From Swiss-Prot:
Belongs to the Lhr helicase family. Lhr-Core subfamily. Residues 43-234 form the Helicase ATP-binding domain. It catalyses: Couples ATP hydrolysis with the unwinding of duplex DNA by translocating in the 3'-5' direction; ATP + H2O = ADP + phosphate + H(+). SMART domains: DEXDc, HELICc. Monomer. Residues 266-416 form the Helicase C-terminal domain. ATP binds at Q39, K62, T63, D181, E182, I352, R369, H372. This is ATP-dependent helicase Lhr-Core. It is an enzyme of class 5 (isomerase).
Length: 841
């Protein structure tokens, strides 16, 4: 196993200048005067051939830390007339926009170094820089073959294609440095895909790996992910060098009784005031629709130079906005998630987060966009929308200040990505099975890959399922494998990558089209679920291909709000801290809370009142107590499980519990889930007894979640994604794009067969849903925690304050914002009446 350790030595300017060639040293002295912290730790170590992961804030000279040792080597070769026509430095970024940035940011210093060299009488050969992505034309690729760049900038997908390009791959064999930027954005299947590409590249080239990351935890795991198994990695962590200021500012004192229009008015007035106090402000919302809404209202208030930036806008528009931001021509820019990553956007004075960013690392990435230089303070303001949001943001801001960051999740042993790379490898040469297995296991996400899973994927690729029109891509014989047929290369080129084709799903009622929903929303549906579309309420009956069947229902409350798919989930570590905070608030006075959490008196009071109300009405569920509450409505019974585990883990537990209860009570059980718990909703003639609750806590969670998944839309959708990644279903064939409708239809034809034979791609679909979507590991961890707590099962006259959002959010599509406020106010009045009655007894 390779060693992972933190670098302790910070080199002086003189020590770094010693290793730099004269033109580079002279240029650096003129332009920068002195090295920044990440440069002091990293440059010399990279020069000495060490793999390095650099974690430092935006504007700290991180990119130059990564490139300078390599550029210095290229200048040295150029001075010695030894610079060959091949690629020396490979830079990989998940963002195409970032690639264009880097190209610009490299060409400028290289030109300046030439000018300095000329001045001091040194002639240099030109160091070429080029970008190769899906936007690169055939003629540009041809030019690269004739005159290769010395520095190549690319994306994970384009690297996978380049590895299999017979001529171009030869140019990769001399690579000395590989730089992976924004590695924190690659802790997903795209990153898993890249980790295998790097191992395949390592077979033909011996290179140093350099990773660049924003604040992420744990860095030791990211380091292993960067370098793979058996290699050393050294971590430069200077994220603490940047001063950060985070404040939680509430637009109103009272979220319950202040009318919506008033909250809205005060919110936009607050935003206007903050914008006017700063030169450039960046506002993050949590949904794309909110982005446009905020921009509209700010313009109405007379705020000038307002722009939006999100993934639904055209690339041209986004680039134009980035350019304007850089030039300081925008007063305020509103974004959803698209500006979280490191595209250079110049100087931002203030970052405002509307609503909770749901994780400390996301908050730090967003707020880190302000105070672009290392010595400047990053300034962020979080504006909560309700009482739960207020509590969450106070805990989040505190965790951010003390540097407590939520853990990342890197998918493991993804069999669909493995299948794709095995096809790519078969195109390179004939492989010995064990040699290929050992190469795959060097990639960190595959270190524990079983030989059985590996052979199952090879056998699938060699056997195909011809009766289902899935043809073999490789041959496998005598412990060796290679490519099969001429069309395999084209299939690989046209279908490589991990990002599935997304589409809208048609909604059909009584044979008629009534609208469409996002696929991400459709995959959450289970039979009997109720949702709202175009102001009408529908019950989900089932789905086939790219259509879902529904029937219109009346007097039924929705179980899934329409915005569910756009919501960010609460990080598990932060959720656990919220539980501890609840207990702390109950046992502290207002002054103690105010001081420790650096909040104003009215915020501390609002939080204290919220906890007291809950405590007087029921109990406060925290890290020692579990609350399960039951209350009845006219037609149904609600059972609310106050589990603070984040929405993904809660959905796993809710599915497991609902599956079990529906079997023993022989009825349909609906669920409604949020970050703070879930509701099981039963018909009025069914009841969950205390004995049933005891049984729930002895449940086989995984078995029940799997049973639930097998009945829901998510399995069909995710199987298509996995099957396209694993080349069982093609997205493009013979220069033709295959529609998502067709892909989905093919997936459903294959799903039954794959389930029957326990196919590796079926197993991968279940793994992806359980581990990557539903966060099963944390769900099981939480399940064990609550078993050790004191459990309170209370029958209540109406929902407790902590349950308001869960009860109302399910209905928030049928009711307008104003009615939602009224509904919460009504529930609150009932709570206060009950408390006062209790007080009189």
């Amino acid at each position: 196993m390779g060693r992972v350790e933190y670098l302790k030595k910070e080199y002086s300017d003189e020590e770094i200048y010693e290793i730099l060639e004269k033109p580079v040293k002279e240029w650096f002295k003129r332009k920068y005067k002195t090295f920044t912290p990440p440069q002091r730790y990293a440059i010399k170590e990279i020069h000495e051939g060490k793999n390095v992961l650099i974690c430092s804030p935006t504007g700290s000279g991180k990119t130059l830390s990564a490139f300078l040792a390599g550029i210095n080597e290229l200048i040295k070769l150029s001075m010695e007339n030894k610079l060959e026509d091949r690629i020396y430095i490979l830079y990989v970024s998940p963002l195409r926009a970032l690639n264009n940035d880097i190209e610009r940011n490299l060409k400028e210093p290289l030109k300046e170094i030439y000018d300095v060299a000329k001045e001091i009488g040194i002639e240099l050969d030109e160091i070429r820089v080029a970008v190769r992505t899906s936007d690169t034309t055939s003629s540009q690729k041809q030019r690269m073959l004739k005159k290769p760049p010395h520095i190549l900038i690319t994306t994970p997908e384009s690297l996978a294609i380049a590895l299999n390009s017979p001529k171009f791959s030869q140019l990769l064999s001399g690579i000395k440095y590989v730089i992976v930027d924004e590695i924190h954005a690659l802790t997903n299947k795209r990153g898993v895909h890249l980790s295998l590409s790097l191992e395949r590249l390592n077979r033909i080239a011996n290179f140093i790996r350099i990773g660049l990351s924003a604040t992420i935890h744990p860095l030791t795991e990211v380091a292993k992910f960067l370098v793979g198994n058996g290699r050393d990695c050294y971590i430069v962590d200077v994220s603490y060098k940047k001063e950060i200021e985070i404040k939680v500012i509430s637009p109103v004192d009272d979220f319950i009784y202040t009318p919506s229009e008033e909250i809205s008015k005060r919110l936009y007035n607050l935003l206007k005031k903050l914008i006017e106090e700063h030169k450039t402000t960046l506002i993050f919302t949590n949904t794309r629709s909110a982005t446009e809404r905020v921009a509209f209202y700010l313009k109405q208030l007379g705020v000038e130079k307002v722009e939006t930036h999100h993934s639904s806008l055209s690339r041209e528009h986004r680039l134009e906005v980035e350019e304007k931001l850089k030039k300081g021509e925008i007063r305020v820019c509103i974004s959803s998630t698209s500006l979280e990553l490191g595209v250079d956007i110049g100087s931002i004075d203030l970052v405002i987060l509307l609503g909770s960013p749901k994780s400390v690392s996301r908050a730090l990435q967003r707020i880190g966009r302000s105070g672009h230089r290392l010595h400047e303070k990053s300034k962020g303001i979080i504006i909560p929308f309700d009482r739960d949001d207020l509590v969450e943001n106070v805990v989040l801001a505190y965790d951010a200040k003390i540097g407590k960051i939520d853990r990342i999740h890197i998918p493991k042993n993804c069999l669909d990505v493995l299948a794709q790379h095995l096809v790519g490898m078969a195109l390179e040469k004939v492989w010995d099975v064990d040699e290929a297995y050992n190469l795959i296991k060097k990639a960190y996400p595959y270190k524990d890959l079983s030989k059985k899973d590996f052979l199952d994927v090879l056998n699938y690729l060699a056997g195909g399922i011809e009766e289902k029109n899935v043809y073999a891509k490789i041959w496998l014989k005598d412990n060796k494998f290679g490519k099969r047929g001429k069309s395999v290369r084209a299939i690989y080129y046209m279908n490589v990558g991990t990002i599935p084709d997304e589409t809208a799903v048609d909604v059909i009622a009584d044979g008629k089209y009534v609208g469409e929903v996002e696929e991400e929303f459709a995959e959450k549906l289970m039979k009997g679920d109720i949702f709202v579309l175009g102001g009408k309420t529908y019950k989900y009956l089932g789905g086939r291909g790219n259509k879902i069947r529904v029937k219109e229902v009346f007097d039924e409350k929705p179980t899934i709000p329409a915005w569910f798919s756009e919501q960010l989930p609460l990080a598990y570590d932060l959720a656990l801290d919220i539980e501890k905070f609840r207990k702390e608030v109950l046992s502290s006075d207002i002054e103690e809370i105010r001081e420790k959490y650096d909040i104003d008196e009215k915020t501390a009071k609002a939080i204290k009142n919220y906890m007291d109300e809950q405590n007087k009405f029921a109990i406060v569920p925290d890290d020692e107590k579990v609350l399960i509450e039951n209350f009845d409505e006219e037609k149904r019974r609600y059972y609310i499980f106050h589990f603070v585990a984040g929405r993904r883990a809660n959905e796993a537990l809710a599915r497991a519990f609902a599956n079990y209860i529906s079997k023993i009570k022989k009825c349909n059980v609906r669920i409604s889930v949020n970050d703070y718990g879930f509701a099981l909703i039963l018909p009025k003639n069914r009841k969950i007894k205390r004995a049933d609750i005891t049984e729930l806590f002895n449940l086989d969670v995984v078995k029940n979640v799997k049973e639930s998944i097998e009945r829901s839309e998510i399995l069909k959708r995710r199987f298509r994604h996995v099957a396209t990644r694993g080349f069982m279903i093609l997205r493009r064939y013979m220069n033709r794009k295959i529609s998502v409708d067709r892909q989905q239809f093919n997936a459903e034809m294959l799903l039954k067969y794959c389930k029957e034979v326990n196919h590796p791609l079926y197993r991968e679909t279940l793994r992806e849903i359980l581990e990557d979507s539903l966060d099963i590991d944390n769900a099981l961890d939480y399940f064990e925690k609550i078993k050790r707590r004191k459990i309170y099962y209370l029958e209540l006259p109406s929902p407790s304050p902590f349950a308001f959002n869960l009860v109302v959010s399910a209905s928030s599509d049928v009711i307008f914002m104003e009615d939602k406020k009224k509904m919460i106010a009504e529930l609150h009045k009932k709570v206060m009446e009950f408390i006062s009655m209790k007080g009189k007894k």
